[in-house]
């Protein structure tokens, strides 16, 4: 489990704005502006009136020492809105040998430069007796019609990552797109063709080329976050959306 130390503190969300900032009010009535480590649309994750949970940094140089970590929605779901946690969570689960699909590697390297488009891979797994495994981690928090969708906004960077992963397979390596589902209401995942059509098309191409897609849910609470169970990727969702157009 990734434990929050010191413990997270609750507050009520007033407004998220300028992508990286949010205004909140603590139970004691103190108004704070906190940092939001999420560049996405955060659809359904930032409704005014939601209970949010924040951490506090001991770095005196930070202008906004508090960071928004979790949202507890008014419907009872938990969401991790800090996208920086996704890589940390997947790396921790790999080190603890909790992901069977990614077991058997001796070394884990982070943020390694690679590819033809000046990219950095989130995680690179290596072992003497197997191919290098390149892992790109994506945080999934958009819930619509009982399904989790990625991305929640058009992502040219995400499109680039799919091209890079496909090239890794062409060059003889193993490549994995790992969807870290950080919304407890999501039980299945699909590409958001209605938001970023090109990303959905590239995902199909990448899978056909041999890129693996793995989706896992996580248990979330103010105490910490822990890997839960594997979730399905809806292939039929891609095909039906394509055929309907």
UniProtKB/Swiss-Prot annotation:
GO molecular function, one term: DNA binding
InterPro entries according to UniProt: SfsA, SfsA_C, SfsA_N
Superkingdom as given in the UniProt entry: Bacteria
Disulphide connectivity of cysteines: none
Coiled-coil portions: none
Family the UniProt entry places it in: Belongs to the SfsA family.
NCBIfam families, sorted: sfsA
Protein name (database record): Sugar fermentation stimulation protein homolog
Species annotation: Yersinia pseudotuberculosis serotype I (strain IP32953)
């Amino acid at each position: 489990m990734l434990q929050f130390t010191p413990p997270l503190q609750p507050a009520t969300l007033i407004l998220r704005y300028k992508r990286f900032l949010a205004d909140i009010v603590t139970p004691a009535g103190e108004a704070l502006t906190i940092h939001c480590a999420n560049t996405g649309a955060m659809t359904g994750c930032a409704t005014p009136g939601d209970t949010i949970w924040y951490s506090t940094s001991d770095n005196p140089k930070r202008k906004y020492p508090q960071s928004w970590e979790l949202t507890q929605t008014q419907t009872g779901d938990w969401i991790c809105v800090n996208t920086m946690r996704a890589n940390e969570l997947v790396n921790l689960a790999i080190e603890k040998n909790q992901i069977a699909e990614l077991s058997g590697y001796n070394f884990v390297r982070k943020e390694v430069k690679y590819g033809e488009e000046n990219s950095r891979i989130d995680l690179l797994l290596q072992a003497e007796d197997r191919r290098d495994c390149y892992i790109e981690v994506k945080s999934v928090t958009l819930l619509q019609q009982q399904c989790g969708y990625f991305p929640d906004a058009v992502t040219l960077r995400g499109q680039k990552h799919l091209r890079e992963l496909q090239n890794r397979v062409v060059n003889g390596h193993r490549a994995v797109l790992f969807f870290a589902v950080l919304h407890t209401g999501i039980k299945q995942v699909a590409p958001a063709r209605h938001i970023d059509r090109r990303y959905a098309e590239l995902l199909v191409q990448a899978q056909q080329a041999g890129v693996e897609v793995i989706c896992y849910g996580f248990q979330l609470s103010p105490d910490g976050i822990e890997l839960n169970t594997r979730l399905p990727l809806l292939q039929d969702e891609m095909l039906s959306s394509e055929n309907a157009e």
